[in-house]
Amino acid sequence: KYFYSIFIKKIIMKYLTPLEMLYKWESEKPHSIYLSQPINGIWHEWTFYEVGQEVRKMASYIKSLNLDKSAKIGILSKNCAHWIMSDLAIMLSGHISVPLYPNLNKGSLNKILLHSETQLLFVGKLDDFELMKGGIPSELKCITYPFYSQNYLIWDDCIKDVQPIQDNIKRS
């Protein structure tokens, strides 16, 4: 039993968290492409360094909002590069991601946002946001991803003049 316990701990300790993987590739292969996606027929690419900088800046911006400790932050979007970046920024800032299905109706969306006590919401690529937006409480601060303007604060504007977090913070 003792041997098994040590064996399991050694196996678990070899795995890196998503943030630790970002730090690793950010330093080892900064100019390699990490994320790419087509937007309006044009491919956009982000290197590990570029993703690291956006994540670090957004994490710094999130920290500047002085949210409650371990605040819940929602992500309402189909899969896209900024979904990954916002999830990493939430982790880096010390908060908790609340991923939301991109096809929720407004009633379900509202219940989840209220029940989870979400304090900030990222809004991105969605098929029919007009049917969903009524479920977002009016007092909830929202940030929209570039390329998907939903009349909220825009990601790029939020991080434009922000200093990135320099430390490689570890979360468990």
Kindly label every feature range from the protein language model.
Residues K1-I12:
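Short, Lys/Arg-enriched N-terminal segments with co-localized hydrophobic residues
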Residues M13-Y34:
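A short N-terminal helical cap/helix-turn-helix that marks the beginning
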Residues Y34-C80, I84, L88, N105-N110, ...:
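Conserved AMP-binding/adenylate-forming core of the ANL superfamily
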Residues S36, Q119, G124, Y145-P146:
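Conserved residues at the C-terminal ends of beta-strands
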Residues G94:
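Structured binding elements
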Residues P102-G134:
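Conserved ATP-dependent adenylate/AMP-binding module captured primarily in the ANL superfamily
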Residues D127-S172:
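ANL superfamily adenylate-forming
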